Amino acid sequence: MKKNKISKNWVNKQRRDIYVRQSKVDGYRARSAYKLMEIDEKFKIFKGGLSVIDIGAAPGSWSQYAMKTAKSGKLISIDLKKMEPIGNSVQIQGDFTEEKTQEEIKKNINGKVDVVMSDMAVDLSLIHI
């Protein structure tokens, strides 16, 4: 299958996806917010006042959900890509495995973290068969 046909199929699938459409209505940056919402409904993770770190945060829908549900808590969103701010959260652009980024996290978290979350995907472009 040609790449152009694959791209068209992906676009058509996105247009039909109920979660993609609902994310636009609800103001989430991506459909993945509903995955976290489902997890939270089952396990009751997010409460007011929590300190939350979102690793691999871009485009930010998990951070949006955490900020909305953890309300008065602290949110740090970390990603290699620059991200638009979410409320009064802290955005750190960097690799969380690097010491410089870890120091920035420590500087902003005040020693205590209640939730560490990540929805990162493996970069398959680096895998060669």
Model-derived regions, located:
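Conserved class I S-adenosyl-L-methionine
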Residues: 48-58
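Local beta-strand N-terminus motif with an aromatic residue
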Residues: 49, 112-113
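Short SAM/SAH-binding signature in class I
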Residues: 113-123
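Conserved SAM-binding loop of SAM-dependent methyltransferases across substrates and taxa
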Residues: 59-70
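S-adenosyl-L-methionine
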Residues: 81-112
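Class I SAM-dependent methyltransferase Rossmann-like catalytic core
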Residues: 1-47
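Conserved small/polar residues in nucleotide/adenosyl-binding loops
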Residues: 127-129
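Conserved SAM-binding motif I beta-strand of class I
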Residues: 74-79
